[in-house]
Amino acid sequence: MIRWLTLSSRHRAAARRGWLSAHKWWLLRRCCQIAALAAFMSGPLAGYWIMRGNFASSEMLGVLGLSDPYILLQSAFAGWPVAAPALVGALLIGLFYLLVGGRVYCSFVCPVNIVTDTAHWLREKTGLTRDRKLDRRTRLWLLLGTLLAAALTGTIAWEYVNPVSMMQRGLIFGAGLGWSIVLLVFLLDLFVSRRAWCSHLCPVGAFYGLVGRFSLVRVSARNRDACDNCGACFSTCPEPHVIVPALKGEGSPLILSGDCINCGGCIDSCPNRVFAMASRLRP
């Protein structure tokens, strides 16, 4: 049973290795997510602009322009001219995620992940069992749909409903439609389907999952002979299907699926230290 603050699937790991060792990746993710939000909110709330803009397009310290490659792709489909600074910013972000793993955005940056993790914690804590099965390929169809919507409307239509943008605006400007969309995602994950948004529906995750297929940094089950089938890694992982080939297969111990979010949950929760961060060069 997964817990958001203290994870019961990690109790054995914590008992054997200590609490901090069994939660270090979880703590690092939360620190990164909060720091990312704080960097964007420092300007509107404190008058000191660390990041100006939003998660789609921003400027760091007034010098470095950064752009979400997914947003830039939509703008191209919408027929907008692509400015050189935006292209450079998108290339920088794209290369970064190509190195560390596309869906690291989902686990270490995206603030909506905090919302969906909280919903998942409440599901387990309250014993909610309803889990409508959703096809993981739905997010790929939604990704295609956002590109078609951009082409048909001449706008980045996705930004009108993007929960990440809505959450950021809600934190800065207060109550509004944005919070309604974030609440809808929360209720969907809580009452309808386990990890419905992040694992099945989010087109942003689908895009970065495609990038993640080629990333250098991977989780490795390099000590898989020590696995005692306790299941802690599967109960912690938001994409448990990615673990089986690496843990139980005969080939590479690397988790190679683009669906892996490189969150380190399996590393934290395993009492036998089966998993570790690695790379394609050194499995």
UniProtKB/Swiss-Prot annotation:
Residues reported to bind [4Fe-4S] cluster 2: C237, C260, C263, C266
Name recorded for this polypeptide: Methylamine utilization ferredoxin-type protein MauN
Keywords associated with the record: 4Fe-4S, Electron transport, Iron, Iron-sulfur, Metal-binding, Plasmid, Repeat, Transport
GO molecular function, one term: 4 iron, 4 sulfur cluster binding
Task of the protein: Involved in electron transfer.
One GO CC term, this protein: plasma membrane
Highest taxon, organism lineage: Bacteria
Gene, per the UniProt record: mauN
4Fe-4S ferredoxin-type domain boundaries: 217-248, 251-280
Pathway, per record: One-carbon metabolism; methylamine degradation
Residues annotated to bind [4Fe-4S] cluster 1: C227, C230, C233, C270
Signal peptide range in chain numbering: none
PANTHER family: FERREDOXIN-TYPE PROTEIN NAPH (PTHR30176:SF3)
